[in-house]
A protein has these predicted regions:
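Polyanion-binding surfaces on beta-sheet-dominated domains and ring/shell assemblies
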Residues: 1-273
């Protein structure tokens, strides 16, 4: 008779509960009530969901990171850099390969053939475009970097790609791959219930479905540069400037969270025998 239930995931010894780090709102009004924000999770329009970010969970990978924000949960693993095949022509720069898979239980629609849908391939292409400018490819000639992303729970495509961008960049840094800077992903939406000058940062699936336009961005806050930008729908230039300014401001806080997670993981590795 089995003494343990194999259907349940047994956490390793020394495991600790998740500690969520709240990202403060960038709103100048400190006495505003969250109950009147109008959002389904009571956040203010310019406030993102609290995130949990933990590097180094996949021991077999060169670098990895798990991220959780609301109903969005995913894990990234980096393998490499490693030499390319002998039959491959010489390339003075490294090659980045990105593969995204959705778990069968990641959304309300069951996926019978994981990895074969166009949603995963589109997300992988977007991740590739967002991360490639941040990697110093010239230092890794004739080599390849394999990045694997598994979506455990999805709360909308744009939220997935934003969280995956941040987690993947942390995984690359944890793998020891030289970067120009950490890449942070963010998304925003223009909702009819809010003025155009108050975009909803980090919208949920429900909020995104009711929005007139959707905006996602990947940027390196340390350098103040944008690596990828995607806009769906129509938005006036004034509102677009507001979205860019708020995303840049919030990304600095998220950059601090990612940096702190890497530092804590490095200190933990140094203490291990």
């Amino acid at each position: 008779m089995q003494a343990t239930d194999r259907r349940r995931f047994t956490a390793p010894e020394g495991s600790q509960p998740l500690n969520y780090r709240s990202i403060p709102s960038t709103s100048s009004s400190s006495n505003s009530s969250t109950s009147t924000s109008g959002r389904e999770d009571k956040r203010s329009p310019d406030q993102v969901r609290p995130i949990f970010l933990q590097p180094g969970l996949v021991t077999e990978a060169a670098g990895s990171a798990y991220i959780e924000a609301g109903k969005t949960k995913l894990i990234c693993a980096v393998y490499g850099p490693k030499p390319t095949a002998l039959s491959t022509a010489f390339n003075p720069k490294a090659k980045l390969n990105v593969e995204v898979k959705f778990s069968p239980f990641s959304s309300g629609v069951r996926r019978f053939v994981p990895g074969k849908d166009t949603e995963a391939s589109t997300l992988a292409a977007t991740l590739h475009q967002s991360l490639l400018p941040s990697i110093i490819l010239e230092n890794l000639p004739k080599s390849q970097i394999d990045l694997f992303v598994t979506i455990l729970e999805s709360d909308g495509w744009d939220g997935d790609v934003s969280m995956a961008t941040t987690a993947a960049s942390v995984a690359l840094a944890e793998a020891g791959i030289q970067l120009y800077g950490l890449t942070i992903g963010l998304c925003a939406a223009s909702h009819p219930a809010f003025p155009s000058t108050s975009p909803l940062l980090d919208p949920t699936r429900t909020e995104a479905a009711a929005s007139s336009s959707f905006f996602s961005i990947a940027l390196m806050p340390a350098l103040g540069s944008v690596t990828n930008l995607r806009l769906t729908g129509t938005i006036n230039p004034t509102a677009l400037d507001v979205v860019l300014e708020k995303c840049l401001e919030v990304s600095k806080g998220l950059h601090g969270v990612a940096r702190q997670a890497l530092l804590q993981n490095a200190e933990k590795v140094e203490r291990e025998p």
